[in-house]
Every structure is written in structure tokens, then in C-alpha cells.
Amino acid sequence: MGKEVFLLDDQGIKRALTRIAHEIIEKNKGAKDIILVGIRTRGVPLAKRLAQRIDQIEGEIVPVGMLDITLYRDDLTKDENDPIVHGSSIDSEINDKIVILVDDVLYTGRTARAALDALVDLGRPKMVQLAVLIDRGHRELPIRADYVGKNVPTSKEEIVRVSLMEIDKKDSVMLEGSKNVV
């Protein structure tokens, strides 16, 4: 069994999100026409935090929605019990808007692909971008994040564990099962 390696604490997460917020504003020449959409579960509080940072920096309130990709996943089988669907909630019109999908960890790209499929069912954005707190590599699909808090090279056996105050009562990112020190 490998070690548990500490990657980010609450201040590290805060700095990463602040940097991503600045990058979003810079790339999109402001915050106009942007909608942040968090992928359930941990993408939602991250999207809300990003919206707060953008408002602090730019003085513009960015709408935040949540996307449930459960029925769009390609790893659900007919043999599984009924999946729990929480539903999506995007109160703003996404047509002709810049939608930034927000998630905690980018790994194979399959979650991002499912989110794109779910998003297209809700409308036709002008552009879709992807923001992630952690990019751990090992893509199985041609997907990359536009905004990354931290790149963490991992083995496929390792697990990146993101804990957020809103869900887990603490902010941290840990690498579990590591044989090396990061």
C-alpha cells in the first residue's frame, strides 16, 4: 500500500481558484456572457467559488449552474441498479453564451465528455471551456482543460482525493496510494 501525499491545503486551493478566475477573465476579455456550470458533485462548489472570485476581481456577477451527468456516463451498464439522478439546474440561458464547465479532477476525460453531451441537450453555447482544480493526466479521450489549478502526474493506481468545505467540512487535495513523493 502506498503513502498519502498532501497536494493542496485550503490556501493552495484558494490561490489556484484565484489564478483560474484571472485566467478566465483574461481569456474571455472580461466576464460578460460567461456562465459557470459545476459538474456534480464537487464541481458545483468550485464553480460558486470561482464566481465569487470573478465578482471580486471584475465586479460582475457570473451565473452559476449545476449539471448532473449521471445519465450521460458511458460506464453505466444495464445490470446496475437504478442510478441516482439529482438533476441539473441552470437558471440562465446558455444559448450564445460562454459556458465554462467546472470539475474537481480531470482524469480520463469521460466525465467532461458526458458533461458536453448533457450541456448540448440544454442549448447551444457560443463556446464551451473546461476548468479543473486538478489535472492528473491519463486521458482516454481527446479532451483538455482550458484552466488548470494544478497538474499532478499520477499512476493509474493512485487516487486524487479532493475535499471541499461545503461537502467534506475541510479543504484539501490528497494523493492516495502514492509510491513517490510529489
Curated annotation (Swiss-Prot):
Cross-referenced Pfam families: Pribosyltran
Keywords (A to Z) from UniProt: Glycosyltransferase, RNA-binding, Transcription, Transcription regulation, Transcription termination, Transferase
An example Gene Ontology biological process: DNA-templated transcription termination
CDD domains: PRTases_typeI (cd06223)
GO molecular-function terms, A-Z: RNA binding; uracil phosphoribosyltransferase activity
Catalytic activity: UMP + diphosphate = 5-phospho-alpha-D-ribose 1-diphosphate + uracil
Motif (PRPP-binding): 99-111
Keyword Glycoprotein included in the entry's annotation: no
UniProt EC number: 2.4.2.9
Top-level EC class: transferase
Subunit structure: Homodimer and homohexamer; in equilibrium.
Function: Regulates transcriptional attenuation of the pyrimidine nucleotide (pyr) operon by binding in a uridine-dependent manner to specific sites on pyr mRNA. This disrupts an antiterminator hairpin in the RNA and favors formation of a downstream transcription terminator, leading to a reduced expression of downstream genes. Also displays a weak uracil phosphoribosyltransferase activity which is not physiologically significant.
Classification via PANTHER family: BIFUNCTIONAL PROTEIN PYRR
Family: Belongs to the purine/pyrimidine phosphoribosyltransferase family. PyrR subfamily.
Protein name: Bifunctional protein PyrR
Species name: Alkaliphilus metalliredigens (strain QYMF)
